Amino acid sequence: MTQRRTRNILAKRKERRFVSGLPKVELHLHLEGAAPPAFIRGLAKEKHLDISGIFDGRGNYRYRDFWDFLKVYEAATSALQTPGDYQRLTLAVLEESAASGVVYSETFLSPDF
C-alpha cells in the first residue's frame, strides 16, 4: 500500500469518527419504520406470532424492493397491538437513537388498534 493511500484511509477514518461524534437530529422519523429488528422479534415471540420469515440469517429485516419492504413492515407492525407495545417501542427507538448521537427527534407514529 502506498503512503498516499494510507494517508487517505487514515483521513477518512478520522472524518468518520468526527462525523459520528457530532450531535444529530431526526426531522421525520416513523416510529414503526425505525423499530429495531430484535425488539420486533422479541415482541412477536411474547405474542406467539410467527414472523420469522421477515428476518435474514443475521437477524436484520429481509426485503429486496419497496414492495417487499411493505410486506415486512406489515408483518413487523402486526406485533404492535397495544399502547404498551408502543411505549416499549418508543423507548427502544429513542435508546438506539441516543446511542447514535441523536439529540432531537420529530417522531411520527401510526398505531393500528
What is each PLM-predicted segment?
Residues 2-113:
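Metal-cofactor-binding active-site regions of metalloenzymes
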